[in-house]
Amino acid sequence: MDGEMTASPPDISACDTSAVDEQTGQSGQSQAPIPKDIAYHTLTKALLFPDIDQYQHWHHVAPMLAKMLVDGKYSIHQQYEYLCLFAQLVAPVLGPYPSPGRDVYRCTLGGNMTVELSQNFQRSGSTTRIAFEPVRYQASVGHDRFNRTSVNAFFSQLQLLVKSVNIELHHLLSEHLTLTAKDERNLNEEQLTKYLTNFQVKTQYVVALDLRKTGIVAKEYFFPGIKCAATGQTGSNACFGAIRAVDKDGHLDSLCQLIEAHFQQSKIDDAFLCCDLVDPAHTRFKVYIADPLVTLARAEEHWTLGGRLTDEDAAVGLEIIRGLWSELGIIQGPLEPSAMMEKGLLPIMLNYEMKAGQRLPKPKLYMPLTGIPETKIARIMTAFFQRHDMPEQAEVFMENLQAYYEGKNLEEATRYQAWLSFAYTKEKGPYLSIYYFWPE
C-alpha cells in the first residue's frame, strides 16, 4: 500500500466505562469515566501498520484484549506491554484478514479467524490468553500450501523479546507430527492436490501465549492430520510416538500407556498434541481428543479414562462436571458433520496432561457451549463462582461479557462463548477457561 494506516475507525466506541486507578493510571479524583479499552485507543494514536490486514486485525482483536487485561487486574504497564506485543509480533503473522468473498487461507480459531481469545479463572484470579496460527499471504497463493514456514518466522521474533521461550521441542516434534519439506517433496502432485482438497482447514501448528502477570508462557499445538494422511498412521499413534521420541528415558511411558489403553478401548484414532515451549525436561505434554458423541456418560468415560482414574481429584472433579453439565443444559446427542457446519454445534473435547514425575494423567474436559444463550451461561458461571469462593469473578462476569460484545443481544446470541474447559485439583480447586468466538 502507498501509505501506512493508523487511528481508530470512526465507529469504534468505548464500551464499558468502569476502571480502577491502578489499572488506568488516573489520579482517582472525580472525572469522566475512563473506558476499559483506553489503552487500545491510546496506542492506536501512535501505531502505524504497513498494510490493511494488520490494521484490521488490530482493530478487531485489540479492543476485547484490552478489556480482558483490565478485567484481569493487570497493571497499566502490563496492559500496554501485552497490547504492544500483539501489535508488533502477533498481528503481522495473522495473515490476510478474512473478509466475505476473499479467498484466503482459512483457520477456525475463534470460529472463523486465525486468532482466538480466552480467559482462565481460578481462585487466584483470571489470566488472559491468546491463541493463533502464524500465517502469511504465501499460504493463500500456493507458495506455502500447507503453511509450514510462518511459525518459524514468528518464533525467531518471539525469542528476541521473551527470553524464556525454548523452541527445542518445536523442532523435535514437528518432524513427527507435521508435513515436513521432505514429506512434501516425496508426494506427487496428485497426492498433494488430494490433501489440499480433503483438508478444508490445513492447520498444522497453533501457538498460544498465556499472558500471565509473571510473564509470558508460550505453548504450541501440533495437529497431525495431514502428516497422518501422508504416512498412514493414526493421530493418536503419531502423538504418542512423538512423545516417546523426545522422552528417551521413558519418564512418561506409564502415563502414555494408561491413556493409550483407553483410546484403544474407546476406538479413538484422532488426537493432537500440545507442549509448553520450555526446557523439554520441564514441559507438560497434553494429548487432546474430540468426540462427536456429546453425552454426559461419554464425558464421564473420557474423564476417568474408562474407570482407570479413581483418585480423589478425578472423583471430586467428576461430581462438579455433572452439576455444571446439567445446569448449563449442554446440547446432547451424536453430532453429525452437518450439525457442526449448519448449526455451529461443537463436540466434547478432553486433554490429558503428563509431566515427568507425575503419577497419573490430569484430565481436562471441554464442554461445548454453542447453542446455549449467552446470558444463561453467564448466570450459571456467576452462581458457580459464588459457590466456589470466587466472589470477585461472580460480581463482574455478566458485566464483562456484555462489554466484550457491545451492542449484541446476549439473551438471543448462542455462539460467543464456545467452550468451557474444566479441571480440578484439591490444592487449587476448580480451574476453568472460557474460549470466545468472534461475532459473525
Curated annotation (Swiss-Prot):
Its EC number is 2.5.1.-, 3.4.11.17. Substrate binds at T108, E116, F223. One of its GO terms (biological process) is proteolysis. Transmembrane segments: none annotated. Dimethylallyl diphosphate binds at R129, K219, Y221, K286, Y288, Y366, Y431, Y435. This is Cyclic dipeptide prenyltransferase. GO terms for molecular function: aminopeptidase activity; prenyltransferase activity. It comes from Aspergillus fumigatus. Pfam families: Trp_DMAT (PF11991). Residues 1-33 are annotated as: Disordered. Keywords: Aminopeptidase, Hydrolase, Prenyltransferase, Protease, Transferase. It catalyses: harmol + dimethylallyl diphosphate = 6-(3-dimethylallyl)harmol + diphosphate; an N-terminal L-tryptophanyl-L-alpha-aminoacyl-[peptide] + H2O = an N-terminal L-alpha-aminoacyl-[peptide] + L-tryptophan; (R)-benzodiazepinedione + dimethylallyl diphosphate = (2S,3R,11R)-aszonalenin + diphosphate; (S)-benzodiazepinedione + dimethylallyl diphosphate = (2S,3R,11S)-aszonalenin + diphosphate. Accepts only dimethylallyl diphosphate (DMAPP) as the prenyl donor but shows broad substrate specificities toward its aromatic substrates. Also shows tryptophan aminopeptidase activity with preference for linear peptides containing a tryptophanyl moiety at the N-terminus. Changing T108A: Decreases the enzymatic activity. Residues 20-32 have a biased composition (Polar residues). Disulfide bonds: none annotated. Belongs to the tryptophan dimethylallyltransferase family.
